[in-house]
Amino acid sequence: MKLCDFEVGLDKPFFLIAGTCVVESEQMTIDTAGRLKEICAKLNIPFIYKSSYDKANRSSGKSFRGLGMDEGLRILSEVKRQLGLPVLTDVHSIDEIEQVASVVDVLQTPAFLCRQTDFIHACARSGKPVNIKKGQFLAPHDMKNVIDKARDAAREAGLSEDRFMACERGVSFGYNNLVSDMRSLAIMRETNAPVVFDATHSVQLPGGQGTSSGGQREFVPVLARAAVATGVAGLFMETHPNPAEAKSDGPNAVPLNRMSALLETLVTLDQAVKRGPFLENDFN
């Protein structure tokens, strides 16, 4: 699959989607994107910057949601203009898609909306690549239906069907907890879409702090290594210069000053895994 200006797939090095959870300010966004660009250039990692102009799904109605669509998109457009990076952001309703698609390179659908057929159809008809997150309530094999919905809508609109990614971000396990089943990554390959692993939301503790979500960022390297060892096309990770002061999802964000070391390890592992054959089908 061609994504932005690079090819993605199990036979290619993993690509990275990374950035702050939410756009907090223009300067921090530019600085964070610039640092990530430097790291990824050094490690030869294809990179897409991500950040949200609005966090529609918050634990509390008083939580920070963002700077608004217009200002958030303006800042993301500055990332493109100043740094030459492709950008990704999530959309939350059909009404937002046209305006967002006019600015960003890749759309993302929130996990909780993966079963909303009209919404998936509208995203698919935007003509943009779409990173479709698997709901925390959804079995991995059910993602085939979601990807098929997107492909059907694209085909009916006369657009390419080869624009959709399936993203794993953990599954609900009791209250305020998520677990990651690495079998899901292999199962989701049956969609014939590139599989992306979200290593930071997978360690989230949804609503675990009462009016906000908690997280266990110390397990991000553990799950990221496991996912790369399983074999993925891409990784998704949120990062922040100072997670303790992040306005959204700080407890599961990777400190920006630790991203280089983590990614260096993951690149080495990815190269080793993709040198050999994937043997899953040989065991049937």
UniProtKB/Swiss-Prot annotation:
Q: Give the originating organism.
A: Burkholderia multivorans (strain ATCC 17616 / 249)
**Coiled-coil region list:** none
Q: Which Pfam family would be a valid example here?
A: DAHP_synth_1
Q: Any idea what this protein is called? A: 2-dehydro-3-deoxyphosphooctonate aldolase
- Annotated localization: Cytoplasm
UniProt GO molecular function: 3-deoxy-8-phosphooctulonate synthase activity
Q: What reaction does this catalyse?
A: D-arabinose 5-phosphate + phosphoenolpyruvate + H2O = 3-deoxy-alpha-D-manno-2-octulosonate-8-phosphate + phosphate
**Which keywords accompany this UniProt record?**
Cytoplasm, Lipopolysaccharide biosynthesis, Transferase
The record lists the lineage as: Bacteria, Pseudomonadati, Pseudomonadota, Betaproteobacteria, Burkholderiales
